[in-house]
Design a protein with these regions (language model features):
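Beta-strand-turn-beta hairpins that frame and shape the catalytic cleft
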Residues: 1-6, 103-114, 144-148, 209-214
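N-terminal active-site segment of His-dependent metallophosphoesterases
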Residues: 1-60, 80, 101
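Active-site neighborhood of phospho(di)ester-bond hydrolases with catalytic His/Asp-centered motifs
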Residues: 8-9, 36-41, 67-74, 116, ...
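Active-site environment of divalent metal-dependent phosphoester hydrolases
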Residues: 14-19, 44-47, 71-82, 120-124, ...
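Extended active-site neighborhood of metal-dependent phosphoesterases/phosphodiesterases
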Residues: 53-138, 143, 181, 236
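Conserved beta-sheet core of the metallophosphoesterase superfamily
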Residues: 166-242
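A short C-terminal boundary segment appended to hydrolase-like catalytic domains
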Residues: 238-281
Length: 281
């Protein structure tokens, strides 16, 4: 049975649209995902009130029965409060969102690991350290080969053509080593956000010897800070098997969320092949 995953990112409470926030909740209630993943940037400026709003949102999702896996983003680290930024960069995140910076979810068909890439020194860019790379390999080594292995970060591990004018966007710090660790761990799907752009492609097409991962980027789910004329959106993923991933981008239309582009990716042992899904009716 396929695992149904809603992948949201960059919800940015403090620069959000309340109507769109309510729209995500309505859509999730209707579709009933097995897991909700939020890949960072819960707030706009890591302020207490913004974290309280984000916490209330998560509490509503959990009260509705949804399992939630979350990682922080760079906006969840204080920008202007320099003392807090360096002394306790994620204290508010841990208090209001989650104390777990390497969350794990596993069921009969998928294993999901979240990794924190937000740092004090990098301002907007992220970083991954060697202990985290080792953890990726360690956690997935114990997973059954039949399960789909999914890695979640805020900052992408791969440089993709999603920057201004579609130039290559910056990858996370130490990404060369991180990609090797992901390859050794046998990760099938890498989820991230950060750039407020949707994108999906085989890692191998972006980085030589990147292994067999499928890279899936989420746009911003609820922020008013839109880029490249992309409306608010999130990803609706069906992991049928580790080599059979269905991706639908769910897009805000001004009054609610509706299904957008729909592709099914199949791995043939060498490449991920994309096949558009034609909706009936």
């Amino acid at each position: 049975m396929a695992a149904r995953i809603a992948h949201l990112s960059d919800i940015h409470f403090g620069a959000h649209d309340e109507k769109v926030v309510a729209g995500t909740e309505a859509w999730l209630q209707q579709q009933q995902p097995d897991l909700v993943i939020i890949s960072g940037d819960f707030t706009q400026r890591a302020r207490v009130e913004q974290f309280r709003q984000a916490s209330a949102y998560l509490n509503r999702l959990r009260a509705a029965g949804f399992k939630v896996l979350a990682v922080p983003g760079n906006h969840d680290v204080p920008l202007y409060d320099v003392a807090r930024r360096f002394a306790a960069p994620l204290r508010r995140y841990k208090r209001y969102i989650s104390n777990d910076l390497c969350p794990w979810y596993e069921d009969d068909s998928v294993a999901v690991l979240g990794i924190n890439t937000a740092r004090s020194l990098t301002i907007k860019d992220g970083r991954i350290n060697r202990e985290q790379m080792a953890l990726i390999e360690e956690r997935f080594a114990a997973v059954s080969p039949e399960k789909t292995r999914i890695l979640v970060t805020h900052h992408p591990l791969y440089a993709m053509p999603i920057g201004e004018g579609n130039e290559l966007a910056e990858a996370v710090g130490r990404h060369e080593d991180a990609v090797k660790a992901v390859c050794r761990a046998g990760v099938h799907v890498a989820l991230a956000g950060h750039f407020h752009r949707t994108y999906a492609e085989a890692a191998r097409k972006m980085v030589e010897k990147a292994g067999g991962a499928l890279v899936i980027q989420a746009g911003t789910a609820t922020s008013v800070r839109l880029r490249n004329n992309e409306l608010q959106s999130f990803n609706w993923i069906h992991a049928h098997r580790w080599n059979d991933i269905e991706l639908q981008v769910v897009v805000w239309n001004g009054s609610g969320f509706e299904r957008g582009s729909h592709v099914r990716f199949g791995f043939d042992g060498q490449e991920w092949l994309a096949q558009p899904v034609v909706q009936e009716g």
